């Protein structure tokens, strides 16, 4: 259904004025009339009415509504502050960044180190600057771990020694050495050469052993080497060592050379019976 528009009629405003001294005419003759005579007569009151036509006024409902401008609401990002660790020389900005600064003890001023995304990054930069300004004894956010013995290095060295013993003397390099071993190539070649050789192919070949009796005869005579045609005894005119050499010498019983314990009673063969074992040959391995 279409809504019928109400037609507003013009408004009329009537103004009425009552004038008790109003007259019908304004002639000069009437001005000469005696007022005393008129006072006794009935006075005539004249009323004036004036109409004013007012234009129609548009109703408030028909007036066009002005569009209201929406005010822009500036939203400030809310930074959620959690229970984080507080670092030395690090503070958080209102917009969420982390700033780092340090005080220079020599110049007595604050040195700006920069702005970072996380507090840990700012703390690390502060630690580096503190070490440069105050030395290794500076208070740090992340102190270095205490120096401990390197147990892994010791265990590696022990393992290398055990491998050397088990491997039959193979030349192994130290795990901490930076120098090349001159025997590494040779040991590798020898190891590759003996790979695949079975123990069944190794035959022990024994050579005849030499006894002490083989050395009983002299290899060379004195005459052949030095060319002596005569013996030493003939050169000096007789026996050099005769039977009576020790005849004039008398030994007491304290030396054990008496009648019962002379040179004849010594068992010389007992002292040299094992001489053949010294010259025995080791078995030779043949492949």
Curated annotation (Swiss-Prot):
DNA-binding region extent: 86-143
Presence of the UniProt keyword DNA damage in the record: no
Subcellular location: Cytoplasm; Nucleus
Domain of life: Eukaryota
Family statement: Belongs to the AP2/ERF transcription factor family. ERF subfamily.
Summary of the function given for this chain in its UniProt record: Component of the cytokinin signaling pathway involved in cotyledons, leaves, and embryos development. Probably acts as a transcriptional activator. Binds to the GCC-box pathogenesis-related promoter element. May be involved in the regulation of gene expression by stress factors and by components of stress signal transduction pathways.
Protein name per UniProt: Ethylene-responsive transcription factor CRF1
Protein species of origin: Arabidopsis thaliana (Mouse-ear cress)
